[in-house]
């Protein structure tokens, strides 16, 4: 059943960390909707900047938003003008003090979300789906990943009947919990309709740390 579950969600608390880090009792639903609105807005606004993921941390009086991007210059803008505009717009979505931090994704070819968005962009530009998938997979393998699997679903090449095509390179052990699997999903808006793109990237094994009796880590 490894293909049917989000690999990140399966590994959260074992080798992966949460994207939202906060605790709430009565306000849980409000915070959840607020997080969703912040992420949706930033993803749409900064799509050209190649945003890999957005982490949100909350304290009693402030919200910290960490944006992981392949192009930090696009997010920050000339003299920090763009980031100030973004801060002002995101501030409207929350009533707490907002802190925005930008972190660069050094190797975008090894990031599953960015690879999926790259394939989707090529499909929108009428590149053959096979060429788009295989070129991105080749770059990822050259970047040093252990394995990559890509799937495209929809009216591929303008066919009358929708279908799914999958390509693999290397190994992607989806059922091994200690395997560091990065997963990304994107949609391409083509003239024939939407095409879904999924990418799994295997980066190697990570051994989970167990807390010992003294409270340290083994």
Curated annotation (Swiss-Prot):
UniProt cross-references to SMART domains, sorted A to Z: KH
**Does the keyword field hold RNA-binding?**
yes
Protein keywords? Ribonucleoprotein, Ribosomal protein, RNA-binding, rRNA-binding
GO CC list: cytosolic small ribosomal subunit
| Record domain KH type-2: where | 38-106
Q: Which InterPro entries match?
A: KH_dom, KH_dom-like_a/b, KH_dom_type_2, KH_sf_prok-type, Ribosomal_S3_C_sf, Ribosomal_uS3_bac-typ, Ribosomal_uS3_C, Ribosomal_uS3_CS
Q: Which family does it belong to?
A: Belongs to the universal ribosomal protein uS3 family.
Alphabetical list of PANTHER family matching this protein: 30S/40S RIBOSOMAL PROTEIN S3, SMALL RIBOSOMAL SUBUNIT PROTEIN US3C
What name appears for this protein in its UniProt entry?
A: Small ribosomal subunit protein uS3
Q: Which organism is it from?
A: Agathobacter rectalis (strain ATCC 33656 / DSM 3377 / JCM 17463 / KCTC 5835 / VPI 0990)
């Amino acid at each position: 059943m490894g293909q049917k579950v989000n690999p990140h969600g399966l590994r959260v608390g074992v080798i992966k960390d949460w994207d939202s880090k906060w605790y709430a009792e009565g306000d849980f639903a409000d915070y959840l909707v607020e997080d969703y609105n912040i992420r949706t807005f930033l993803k749409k606004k900064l799509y050209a900047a190649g945003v890999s993921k957005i982490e949100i941390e909350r304290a009693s009086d402030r919200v910290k938003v960490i944006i992981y991007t392949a192009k930090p210059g696009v997010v920050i803008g000339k003299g920090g003008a763009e980031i100030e505009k973004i801060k002002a717009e995101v501030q409207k979505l929350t009533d707490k003090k907002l802190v925005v931090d930008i972190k660069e994704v050094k190797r975008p070819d090894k990031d599953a979300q960015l690879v999926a968005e790259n394939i989707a962009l090529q499909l929108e530009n009428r590149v053959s789906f096979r060429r788009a998938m295989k070129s991105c997979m080749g770059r990822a393998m050259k970047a040093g990943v252990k394995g990559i699997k890509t799937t495209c679903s929809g009216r591929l090449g303008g066919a009358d009947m929708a279908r799914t095509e999958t390509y693999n390179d290397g190994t992607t052990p989806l059922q091994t919990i200690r395997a560091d699997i990065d997963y990304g999903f994107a949609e391409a808006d083509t003239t024939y309709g939407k095409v879904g793109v999924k990418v799994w990237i295997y980066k190697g094994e990570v051994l989970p740390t167990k807390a010992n009796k003294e409270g340290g880590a083994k």
